[in-house]
Amino acid sequence: MALLPVLFLVTVLLPSLPAEGKDPAFTALLTTQLQVQREIVNKHNELRKAVSPPASNMLKMEWSREVTTNAQRWANKCTLQHSDPEDRKTSTRCGENLYMSSDPTSWSSAIQSWYDEILDFVYGVGPKSPNAVVGHYTQLVWYSTYQVGCGIAYCPNQDSLKYYYVCQYCPAGNNMNRKNTPYQQGTPCAGCPDDCDKGLCTNSCQYQDLLSNCDSLKNTAGCEHELLKEKCKATCLCENKIY
């Protein structure tokens, strides 16, 4: 899986930086708080529902404690770079978006900045220019991703970008084979008519295929084959679900 690009945003400096990041503006962003978790999930679902062109198979996102633990652990390292994909795995591979700021910024603003990369993206074509950064957007709206967990850290070891936001996404998006079409275009919920909640699908799959030809392997070898049991769990175990 390709690493996502990192978004750097320099915001206006506060008159003084807090010791150890204990100021109320920072602690209000900690993702141990239910209201912060709701803000993050609701913002993601609001944006996923609003994609243009509309999506027929966009899953509704939910908060994951396991994913949050991984995201917070990585944020605490204050490296300002992506984690090793192996360190953010759950039952599936997981993606990751990063945001850095010089002062505390709301989660909604950070998430919106990732989505705003849509301005440099054309559905079905890809980035508008070779240097355009769109990987945060495509991960955020990846149709089969349904779990999100985020963490934030204050990083006094950094010169200016001292606030480090990390969101991880499971299953991972940005599959190189279909990165230019992060979802299926169509009427909302057309791909999940019996599992729809306000324009988003709820029939998620907890597994992920590790091979690109699992459908054909299922037809030729069957799901009892050891290879499919290990590498094609979504195809074999998630009938009528989105993966």
Swiss-Prot record:
SCP domain span: 41-169
Protein's UniProt keywords contain Signal: yes
Subcellular location: Secreted
CDD domains per record: CAP_CRISP
UniProt cross-references to Pfam families, sorted A to Z: CAP, Crisp
Gene3D superfamilies: CAP, Crisp domain
Assembly behavior: Interacts with NSUN4 isoform 3.
UniProt protein name: Cysteine-rich secretory protein 2
Organism: Homo sapiens (Human)
